[in-house]
């Protein structure tokens, strides 16, 4: 297994637990609601949409709990006070996995939490005997693209999202 990624002082790992599904959804919403991703994927800009997305991810037979984490900020006694980051993972095939929705809330960005999340999730994929992991990222999210590159991801293709009919009518 990979070395357990270190978190900054005052943060802790929260492993997947079904009771935490709304916590994941809330962090996902806070992470993406004001970002370009929420315009491309409207469910990310809506708390109910994030709850629905988390349910869709976690009820799939391909869901991998050991790749799914929250990072929480803790008080002096170690009690979680603010959930700051979330990640989930799915099995795509026998040996291939896919990272889903790496999200860090705006006030906790720049602390290395995204990198730690990716590393922790990759360890879970490795424990599940995955030898290849993929993810999708919005090309204009330069910070995320750079992060993924530094942990070993490479661009293998570019995809374009179809324009919705309602947006066409606006022109």
Task: Name each model feature, range by range.
Residues 1-17, 162:
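Acyl-donor-binding surface of acyltransferase catalytic domains
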Residues 12-39:
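A short beta-loop-alpha structural element at the N-terminal edge
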Residues 31-36, 44-96, 100, 105:
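Acetyl-CoA-dependent GNAT
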Residues 96, 125-136:
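Conserved GNAT acetyl-CoA-binding A-motif
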Residues 101-104, 110-127, 146-150:
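Conserved acetyl-CoA-binding loop-helix of GNAT-fold acetyltransferases
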Residues 123, 168-171:
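Extended, charge-rich intrinsically disordered regulatory tails
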């Amino acid at each position: 297994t990979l070395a357990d990624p270190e978190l900054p002082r005052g943060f802790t790992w929260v492993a997947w637990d079904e009771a935490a599904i709304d916590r994941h959804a809330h962090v996902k919403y806070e992470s993406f609601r004001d970002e370009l991703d929420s315009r491309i994927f409207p469910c990310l800009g809506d708390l109910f949409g994030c709850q629905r997305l988390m349910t869709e991810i976690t009820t799939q037979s391909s869901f991998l709990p050991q790749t799914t984490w929250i990072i929480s900020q803790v008080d002096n006694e170690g009690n979680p006070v603010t959930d700051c980051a979330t990640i989930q993972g799915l099995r795509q095939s026998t040996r291939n996995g896919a990272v889903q929705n790496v999200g860090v809330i705006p006030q906790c960005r720049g602390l290395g939490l995204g990198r730690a999340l990716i590393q922790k999730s990759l360890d879970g994929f490795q424990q599940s005997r995955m030898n290849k992991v993929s993810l999708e990222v919005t090309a204009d999210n330069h910070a995320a693209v750079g992060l993924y590159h530094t942990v070993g991801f490479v661009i293998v293709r570019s995809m374009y999202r179809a324009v919705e009919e309602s947006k066409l009518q606006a022109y």
